């Protein structure tokens, strides 16, 4: 996918990221939906800038991805990050389906896990850090509400480092879906699937790996064997920032019930649920969300360095 020639009018890679790719330095992709739809301003922009700095301190180059004025951008300026933060929900949330239309219309777009993977792959970036992946929504057996992130993971060669699937989802059905499509679900130093705000859940990952080098080797073997598709690395939230299971589950259950009552569906459901859970937990879930992103950025940096060492 990285060999596809794409017009610079459609895809622009920042000089810093371009230099890293050209000189075979490690790069970590970051998404932008977390900026515009995942947190309130100014915390969203501040967090995004701090996550970039965290990655730089580890050695790799960060590449925040978004659509600005109809251009797919890999590596944003601080001004562009602040624009996405300020505009918030006025910025279109862009998954695979929406991407060509937002670009064609010359609009701004915040990329989800799926569209960030697509653009990262176009640029030749193999490692991506986020908060949590989308998945199968609760009640999907009736609504068929399944995030496009999962299909992207089945098809696109990018490793996604996350704190598991967002705990507002049906974790059991999400793991089943990933298994059906052959997506490895790796637990980093854990056999239990992390549940975003909580370190564990009642579900298991498909394999436990304990080091970034083991993960990098698995990536290289998978793709060199012609096994296309991504890998999910589920990295538990640090213990000191994890939320008590009982209180977070009560908040999630209430938020899900309210979403159903208000008819919130589709791509609006995740931002609604995360915002409502933050309100119901007095902002504690937002603090946890920010910390788990930092934690994932650090692990993604280690994996990117190890992978670059392996493939040269």
Positions of the model-derived regions?
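Active-site glycine-rich loop that binds ribose-phosphate moieties when present
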Residues: 110-112, 141-154, 158-179, 212-217
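Glycine-rich nucleotide/cofactor/substrate-binding loop typically near the N-terminus or early
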Residues: 32, 37-39, 45-101, 224-240, ...
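Anionic-ligand binding region
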Residues: 198-224
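General beta-strand structural signal in soluble alpha/beta enzymes
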Residues: 28-30, 62-67, 103, 109, ...
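Solvent-exposed alpha-helices and their adjacent loops that cap or buttress functional pockets
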Residues: 19-22, 27-28, 57, 119-122, ...
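A C-terminal functional module that forms or caps the active site or interfaces directly
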Residues: 227-295
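A glycine- and small-aliphatic-rich helix-loop capping segment at beta-alpha/alpha-beta transitions
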Residues: 42-48, 80-85, 135-154, 177
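N-terminal glycine-/serine-/threonine-rich phosphate-binding loop
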Residues: 1-57
């Amino acid at each position: 996918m990285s060999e596809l020639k794409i017009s610079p009018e459609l895809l622009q890679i920042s000089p810093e990221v371009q230099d890293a790719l050209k000189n075979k330095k490690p790069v970590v992709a970051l998404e932008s939906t977390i900026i515009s739809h995942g947190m309130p301003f100014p915390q969203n922009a501040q967090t995004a800038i701090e996550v970039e700095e965290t990655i730089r301190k580890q050695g790799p180059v960060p590449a925040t991805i978004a659509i600005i004025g109809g251009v797919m951008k890999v590596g944003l300026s601080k001004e562009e990050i602040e624009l996405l933060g300020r505009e918030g929900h006025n910025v279109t949330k862009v998954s695979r389906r929406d991407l060509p239309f937002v670009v064609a219309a010359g609009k701004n777009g915040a990329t989800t896990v799926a569209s960030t993977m697509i653009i990262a792959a176009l640029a030749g970036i193999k490692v991506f850090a986020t908060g949590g992946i989308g998945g199968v929504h609760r009640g999907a057996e009736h609504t068929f509400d399944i995030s496009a992130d999962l299909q992207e993971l089945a098809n696109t060669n990018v490793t996604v480092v996350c704190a598991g699937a967002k705990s507002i989802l049906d974790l059991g059905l999400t793991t089943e879906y990933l298994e059906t499509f052959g997506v490895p679900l790796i637990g980093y130093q854990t056999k239990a699937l992390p549940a975003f705000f909580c370190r564990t859940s009642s579900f298991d990952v498909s394999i436990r790996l304990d080091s970034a080098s083991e993960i990098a080797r698995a990536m290289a073997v998978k793709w060199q064997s012609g096994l296309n598709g991504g890998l999910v690395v589920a990295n538990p939230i640090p213990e000191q920032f994890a939320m008590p299971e009982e209180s977070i589950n009560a908040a999630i259950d209430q938020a899900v019930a309210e979403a159903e009552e208000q008819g919130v569906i589709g791509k609006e459901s995740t931002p609604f649920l995360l915002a409502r859970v933050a309100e119901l937990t007095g902002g504690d879930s937002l603090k946890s969300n920010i910390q788990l992103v930092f934690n994932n950025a650090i692990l993604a940096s280690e994996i990117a360095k190890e992978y670059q060492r392996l493939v040269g």
